[in-house]
Amino acid sequence: VHSIPGEDNDEGLVVLADGCLRKYIACKGINALLFDELDREQMANQFAALANSCESDIQIIIKSRNLPVDEYLSKYQSLVKTDIDYLNWYADHTDKWFRDIQDVHFVPQREFYIVVGYQPDDCKDFSKPWSGRRSVQKHEEYVDILNRLVRTCFEQLRASNLRPQVLSRKEVRDLIYIELNPSLSQLDPHAPTTIAGTSEASTLAVSALKVTDDHLWLDGKFIGTQYLSAPPHETWMGWLVDLLTLSVEYTFSTFIHVCDQDKVRKRLQFNYRTGVVTSTQLATPDLDSIESTRSAATVIQEFLRSSNKAFDISMYISTNAESKEKLIQHMDEIRRVFKNRGATMDRGQMLQLDAWQSTLPVGVDKLAIVHQVMSPVVGTFWPFFTAGCGTPDGVPFGFAIASREPVLLNPFFRGAGKDANNMFVVGTTGAGKSFAISMLILRLLPLGTRFVLIDKTVDKFGAYRFLTELLGPDLCAYIDLGPGSGLILNPFDLGPEDQAGTPSADKVSTLLSLFDIMLAPEGRDELNVEEKSLLDGLIHVAYMEAGLQNKVPIMSDLARVTAQAAASETDPTQRDRLSQFARGMSLFTKQGAFGGLVDGYTNFDTDKLFTVFDTRDVNDPRLERMAVFILTEFIRRKAAECKLRGARFAAVIDEAAMLMRFKAGARLLDDLSRRARHYGMMLVCITQQLKDFFRQSEQADSVIKNSHMKLILRQDPSDLKVLKETLRLSDAEVTAIEGFSRDEEKRKDSQMLLIVGAVHGTIRLVPSPMDYWVCTSEPIHDIPRRTEMMKQIKSKNPSFNHTDMCRQAVFFLGMHQE
């Protein structure tokens, strides 16, 4: 390294001692274990396109470091921020239980880097070293060329869903420093600041180094490096996937050198001519040579007629250990993994220094032991494999089926390429949708997240009712919404985005959509423009009159204003229309059949930590659509309030297909999914009726597109085709979904496909015994047993309230099960 110029936040540029320039791109891996043959072929083609588009050499680096599982899971406790004792206790219990059941000791953390190089004209003369000087103009000219190469590489990586990001100067210095100081960097991973008068190399390379024939000793670590001496006889997409199975830490470096294409053509033609002579002009023709000559002719013709290029590939992999004996074991494991794929790794005897330097992130192939391949084949060297799924931090949620690694889930994590916090959950009856979401709610509540949930249960033992009873009336509310419940949610309530006494344009638009449901004639989904114009004016009058008394209007107020307008109207057509509106509204006032739901001021606490609205008693189809619509609008207001207070907010709509059955509901759900990012909220849409959900296909597609996370549980076979097309699932993923076991163990170990952005993976949802007894809604055995346990606890502790009984019951049932 000659220098790393610029400020820390600038794009990282490394100038090497020979005058060459380097820039760096970091990217994410892809869990390709569920990809089918077509997907893998496409990935190989994209990687070949990346190699073809590069006009200079590139180095691809994979750094795999093993994070102790306890340290990995500590990310959950670091996010907990609640002053509620029971939630703190539950988070601690979950954390300890999840640690106890781990069957892995570490979680591999894989980082992927691409080093793009450029050799300027003033350093191509190998007969004399670079002077170390060039004019500012020349330097900027060369950097512009390098930037163009980086942009080309960047776009190719982005097209492959690898989420590339150009590293800053500080990130580049830290990357190099960590490799040169393996022990020091564990104490502080940040490189020392550049010191005036001291070379960059001296600043970064501060550790002692000792070179032996078969290993290096660097900063207290024994390091061994091996190189690829013979690739497999035939490579295929995925032959490098076994790197995921390595239990050792390693740095894997691949160089792709662009060959001189003219020289390659001449060499191929010479080999062909030589083969023709040796195979045909001998006394006894060599049939094997004739056949190989024909194959060579085919390769030459294909190469000459296509845009394919020839590349020199070299591969190196280094690992470290605390002792020489342990290092030998690590190197043996690496060789064994490559041997299983038909490749040979050489120990690098007497070549350890050059081999190790070829793994450093400076884009220099010191050893240069290369293997020539054509561009279709270079695509099979795709190295960006990962077995991870979930999010970088969050709540413990399950285990990856492929790697057994713990899976964390944080809907609110911030990452590149993340559009929204929304989640889409789909599964057939009994697949465990409500169970999974109940468990997620239980683990997100200690993180300070507030929840509103809409559900329509079959009986009084709803999937979420017990969860509210467990947390208690001080924290939760379970609202049985219905015409006869006595509980009212006023649709005219204003939110923080509305001025006092004056509805915003969005509020008026939402009310007009509500009146589409209430007043639209049979056969029509909505009112016409003229009818909406009349109602718009009446709504403003109702708000103005109520505002004089420092109140918001209720449905009776609007009905009265409408009746008064009809009485004073002189135009017969308008009078008839207003009278028709007034009669229609009267059905939804206290004098009408449905007024008990919407006519009056909101009469329950809307500021609980967790609120569940159960619409089981809303049976009329039109009233049901109204109720779900009003509740969804209530969610929008709560999201705006939480944003104003800086609180996390999540809304769950269980069976979101209810909203998709009518246009106004579909538009509202679509609008809410789009605005969720603005509010910083999480919207969870749950459905089992996929065909109903797609009744309004445009809005349904938009809702799913705005869902960064998706949980796909066991499916009805008839829905798999729609699901595959909608979510663009591979054949392998569909096969995995078909193989998800039925709920014979009552969701104690259910399986699902988890999609977080571009990362797909199958996971096992493994609740703790206490989670199970909180979240279960199994009516034949579980609920009666839980109820009986509560009675026993009450008989022994008469002073316990209902919340205490719930908490003790699940605790003892969990202990018994465990």
Named regions from a protein language model:
Residues G430:
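Walker A (P-loop) phosphate-binding loop of P-loop NTPases
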Residues V425:
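Hydrophobic anchor at the beta1->P-loop junction of P-loop NTPases
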Residues G12-L13, K23-N31, E37-S56, I61-S64, ...:
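P-loop NTPase motor domains
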Residues H93-K96, I101-H105, D121, T152-E155, ...:
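P-loop NTPase motor core of the ASCE superfamily
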Residues K433:
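Conserved lysine of the Walker
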Residues L442-V452, L471-D474:
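Post-Walker A helix-loop "phosphate-sensing" segment adjacent to the P-loop in P-loop NTPases
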